[in-house]
């Protein structure tokens, strides 16, 4: 299950009572009712915890296990060509006394990616350029844990208050020499409030996020006198040193501050929520003896809207999002100094900065998305739907002195449809998407560098400039089961997909999930 599906499940549970009748709320909510609640909700699409009670929530939860496999011919070099995963996911919305409503989530994902190279870190693309890796392909094991705890109050006059904590741990280990291990800690704390007047609500959320990723050391099982380890500084610029993994350490620490401002209009037949936000991040990069190759800065601006309107037979949903992100890296030239204490004889090691290249590397990202879905709905749930959507993405990477640049643009648009059969016990969901690339450019100052030939040129020729289409099909069957007088809705879901690229490469994936709603 990918991130989009997980977010969808969150929305379903958050908004289970938005337009459901009171008798149904006391019963077990099935697949059809979850889809209706998700489509009609507004605040569950945001991270503003104060808005939890504006969607009229009830106690509801879900738990599931999922196993998946993906094989990819059409991929980038640093991604790998095969992935096996096992995931456990559970979440719960719960009243906490008279005045509070809470949400909790636990998500554990483990897996193995094969034939990945040139990157030993999690954020390889369009991010901090000071990464590292080996040109020798290998398998990588990952273990990721994601926790979320959010609580919102009921109304105190026109006011509501909330607090949300997102906490993630991750481990990415390479299983072939040189054997690196990347450890990640990421948490985000976001207090919020809303103010309601008439049909309108204003919301404000501020957040602090700290991201830390560390490669404490790199080990080897065998001795290879020709094995190089590379450190990158942006675009094709990579320095490969024989035995460079010996004593190597790298740490990334990012501090981000941001806010979200929301405005919502809610009525029984028509509702809309618009949210705008700004984030600013500052990320330090450290090595042995606090060596600093550079510093990375990010600015992110986003605006999003969700609008729904209801007729006796139909529920219309329109969603739009626009986001612009700009990042730049200052590159340092530092010299190691060794100071010897005349009394103890101990040496002190430190790095002194001699030169700074301001904004030597720059990233610009623009993402726009627009979607419309027409749902056939009754008071009990959605019986079927059809939707269209499109996304536009623009990527620019630039490196100065010497000058190198990369530009990538594509449009991705698709059609989706689904329908429930046998009293909505059995659901079929299908989707078809096209990816059209345009206006791509790659200009490298050193086209003969190993990183340029094996990564940038290879990805540009075989991935970035290639059109593709993909199709997916999901089958879901659910069955209520009563244990000790309590009924839960158990389900089993089989999901598959296929991608075909214009260069005759293809990808395939399949997953099986078993779970229950309680």
Report the location of each language-model feature.
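Outer-membrane beta-barrel "beta-signal"
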Residues: 29-30, 195-199, 506-518
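Outer-envelope beta-barrel architecture signal
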Residues: 57-63, 98-104, 157-161, 198-202, ...
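Transmembrane beta-strands of outer-membrane beta-barrel pores
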Residues: 67-71, 108-112, 167-171, 197, ...
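Outer-membrane beta-barrel translocator domains and adjoining extracellular loop/strand segments
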Residues: 73-79, 115-121, 173-180, 215-221, ...
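Residues that define the transmembrane beta-barrel architecture of outer-membrane proteins
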Residues: 82-88, 141-147, 181-189, 253-259, ...
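Residues on the lipid-exposed face of transmembrane beta-strands in outer-membrane beta-barrel proteins
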Residues: 88-94, 147-153, 189-195, 259-265, ...
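Short, flexible helix-coil linker/hinge segments at the edges of structured domains or between repeats
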Residues: 117-131, 207-253, 282-293, 336-348
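Long, internal scaffold/assembly segments composed of regular secondary structure
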Residues: 240-388
């Amino acid at each position: 299950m990918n991130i989009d599906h997980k977010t969808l499940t969150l929305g379903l549970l958050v908004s289970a009572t938005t337009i459901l009748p009171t008798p149904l709320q006391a019963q077990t909510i099935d697949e059809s009712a979850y889809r209706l609640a998700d489509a009609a909700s507004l605040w569950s699409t945001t991270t503003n915890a104060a808005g939890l009670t504006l969607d009229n929530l009830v106690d509801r939860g879900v738990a599931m296990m999922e196993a998946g496999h993906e094989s990819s011919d059409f991929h980038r070099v640093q991604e790998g060509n095969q992935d096996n995963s096992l995931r456990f996911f559970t979440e719960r919305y719960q009243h906490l006394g008279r005045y509070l409503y809470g949400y909790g989530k636990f998500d554990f994902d483990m897996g193995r990616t094969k034939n990945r190279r040139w990157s030993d870190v999690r954020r390889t693309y369009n991010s901090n350029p000071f990464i590292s890796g080996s040109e020798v392909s290998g398998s990588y094991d990952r273990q990721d844990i994601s926790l979320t705890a959010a609580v919102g109050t009921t109304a105190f006059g026109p006011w509501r208050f909330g607090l949300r904590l997102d906490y993630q741990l991750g481990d990415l280990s390479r299983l072939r020499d040189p054997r690196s291990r990347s450890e990640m800690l990421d948490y985000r704390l976001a207090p919020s409030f809303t103010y309601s007047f008439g049909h309108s609500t204003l919301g404000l959320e501020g957040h602090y996020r700290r991201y830390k990723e560390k490669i404490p050391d790199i080990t080897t099982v065998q001795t290879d006198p020709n094995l190089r380890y590379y450190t990158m500084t942006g675009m094709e610029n990579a320095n490969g040193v024989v035995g460079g993994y010996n004593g190597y350490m790298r740490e990334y620490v990012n501090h981000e501050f941001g806010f979200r401002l929301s405005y919502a209009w809610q009525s029984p037949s028509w509702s809309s929520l618009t949210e705008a936000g700004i984030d600013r991040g500052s990320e330090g990069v450290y090595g042995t003896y606090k060596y600093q190759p550079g510093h990375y800065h990010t600015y992110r601006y986003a605006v999003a809207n969700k609008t729904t309107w209801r007729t006796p037979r139909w529920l219309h949903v329109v969603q739009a999002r626009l986001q612009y992100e700009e990042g730049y890296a200052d590159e340092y030239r530092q010299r190691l100094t060794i100071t010897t204490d005349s009394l103890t004889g101990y040496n002190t090691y430190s790095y002194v900065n001699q030169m700074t290249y301001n904004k030597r590397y720059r990233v610009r990202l623009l993402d726009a998305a627009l979607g419309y879905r027409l749902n056939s709905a009754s008071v009990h749930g959605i019986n079927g739907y059809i939707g269209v959507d499109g996304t536009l993405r623009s990527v620019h990477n630039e490196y100065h002195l010497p000058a190198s640049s990369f530009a990538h643009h594509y449009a991705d648009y698709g059609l989706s449809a689904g329908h429930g059969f046998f009293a909505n016990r059995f659901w079929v969901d299908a989707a078809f998407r096209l990816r059209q690339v345009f206006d791509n450019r790659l200009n490298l100052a050193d086209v003969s560098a190993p990183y340029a030939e094996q990564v940038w040129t290879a990805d540009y020729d075989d991935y970035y400039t290639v059109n593709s289409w993909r199709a997916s099909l999901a089958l879901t069957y659910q069955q209520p089961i009563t244990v000790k007088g309590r009924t839960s809705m158990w389900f089993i879901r089989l999901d598959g997909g296929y991608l075909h690229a214009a260069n005759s490469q293809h990808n395939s994936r399949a997953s099986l999930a078993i779970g229950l709603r309680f």
